[in-house]
Design a protein with these regions (language model features):
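Non-catalytic, mobile gating and regulatory segments of ester bond hydrolases
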Residues: 1-5
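N-terminal capping segment at the start of a domain
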Residues: 9-26, 174-176
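Cofactor-binding active-site loop characterized by glycine-rich and histidine/acidic residues
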Residues: 17-21, 32-163
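Glycine-rich beta-alpha junction loops
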Residues: 68-69, 73, 176-177, 237-240
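Short acidic, glycine/serine/threonine-rich loops at helix termini
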Residues: 74-75, 103, 153-155, 181-185, ...
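Short secondary-structure boundary/capping segments
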Residues: 80, 187, 247-251
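Thiamine diphosphate
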Residues: 109, 113-116, 121-225
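Glycine/aspartate-rich loop-and-adjacent alpha/beta segment that forms the canonical ThDP
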Residues: 213-279
Length: 279
């Protein structure tokens, strides 16, 4: 896909996020929207996957370590063809397979159940090690939140990955600067993030604008060309990206829009999509 096509797809992913969270009357829109461009690039450009064969042995693996942003993952999976887009409206509903956090046993395309912060990266490291030991070529990607990396387990996993030189592993940090309790650097600062990963023998890519498709593409290309080290992509993003009243507002970390707010959000995204079509 070209840049415009990816941008339009990201716009659709955002619409799916807002629709799902509104229908659920609960969920985490802010961090889902900040990572929407990354979800889009992964599922429509980067990952070796097949929606018709979700468990094919040589597929690339993706672990959403910040599992509360499941609406972003679900929207990307639906648009990629893993399940009907209409099912996004059943998010968190009784009897729905689209739970509040990813469930590998019930959701096509989900490689790891997640939600307990810090555990997803550990699972991803195990997958990457398994591929190395088995001589398999698949790659493993995991997306973390910047608040999540306050968890000690993250750094145990990073230490092991760097020590084992797992160059088939890509760790992405969604550095939107906000977590549920406020600005990350005021709650419990993990900065400088880049230097911490470098200390554990990671190749680090500082992604200045994690909502820009050209920069995202360049970051993943650099990761793919890195040998002998795992890669950490530190993606500087905007919490709530794409919805005017949600951008950089910590209150939208874990709150659903009401009917009026939903209409405004969808109008914002409609206008963005129309503007992209005119480019």
């Amino acid at each position: 896909m070209n840049k415009q096509e990816l941008q339009l797809k990201a716009n659709e992913v955002r619409k799916g996020i807002v629709t799902a969270v509104h229908a659920a009357k609960a969920g985490h829109p802010g961090g889902s929207l900040s990572a929407a461009d990354i979800f889009t690039y992964l599922y429509f450009e980067e990952l070796n996957i097949d929606p018709k064969d979700p468990k094919k042995p040589d597929r690339d693996r993706f672990v959403l370590s910040k599992g509360h942003t499941a609406p972003g993952l679900y929207s990307a999976l639906a648009l990629r063809g893993y399940f009907p887009v209409e099912d996004l409206r059943t998010l968190r509903h009784l009897g729905s397979y689209l739970q509040g956090h990813p469930d590998m046993k019930h959701i096509p395309g989900v490689d790891m159940s997640s939600g307990s912060l810090g555990q997803g990266i550990s699972a991803a490291v195990g997958m990457a090690l398994s591929a190395k030991l088995s001589g398999d070529d698949y790659r493993v990607y995991t997306l973390l939140g910047d608040g999540e990396i306050q968890e000690g387990q993250v750094w145990e996993a990073a230490m092991f990955a760097g020590f084992r030189k797992l160059d088939n592993l890509v760790v992405i940090v969604d550095n939107n600067g906000l977590q549920i309790d406020g600005p990350v650097d005021q709650v419990c600062s993990p900065y400088p993030i880049n230097e911490k990963f470098k200390a554990f023998n990671f190749h680090v890519v500082d992604l200045a604008d994690g909502n820009d498709m050209d920069q995202i593409a360049a970051a993943f290309a650099e990761a793919r060309n890195t040998k002998g080290q795992p890669t950490a992509i530190i993606a500087h993003t905007v919490k709530g990206k794409g919805v005017s009243f949600m951008e950089n507002q910590v209150g939208w970390h874990g709150k659903a829009p009401n009917d009026e707010e939903y209409a405004i959000a969808m109008e914002d995204l409609k206008k963005e999509g129309e503007a992209l079509c005119q480019k």
